[in-house]
Amino acid sequence: MKYLRVLIALILVLTPQSSEAATSKSLAFTAEVWADNWFALYINGKKVGEDSVSITTQKSFNSETIKFVATYPLTIGFIAKDYVQSKSGLEYLGTPNQQIGDGGIKFQIRETASNKLVSVSDSTWKMKVGNTAPLNPECEKSTQPDIDCKFLNTSIASNWSSSSYIDKSWSSAKIF
């Protein structure tokens, strides 16, 4: 059974994908994650790591390697966030390069001992956007973006990272 979810809100939650293997013993895994700008990785409903660079740091792309121990089947989920300065959804406020924020994440997870690829980011993942801004892109060059830019916050279920969560209403991940 394979399913995955992403939630970008200016949080993007990539959520559960189950990966199955012939064993239920604990194994070591290595996740390589590239994110613009920040992420947290959840395995079987528990956070096993997060980006070492704070979300309040404006940086283009971060790369992290996270090692963890888990048992199959794996339920894999991510929360991903793009750096934003305010609810407007814009970056570089008040500068000539003020723009709509953009974010993304890609990853691969392998069994550490065998180097067997367990999961990789692709279009089979599901995603849910928690915070969308701006809803009116024409506000991008506004001198008052916190007033002129509209936004939408959508609640995310507290059990989104569990293997029993139903993600049928979530969209397919977008690949760029």
For the regions a protein language model found, what residue spans apply to each?
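Accessory carbohydrate-binding/adhesion or oligomerization-edge regions at the termini
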Residues: 22-29, 34, 75-176
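Sec-dependent signal peptide recognition
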Residues: 2-9
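Beta-strand-rich ligand-recognition modules
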Residues: 34, 38, 42-93
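C-terminal segment of classical bacterial N-terminal signal peptides
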Residues: 13-20
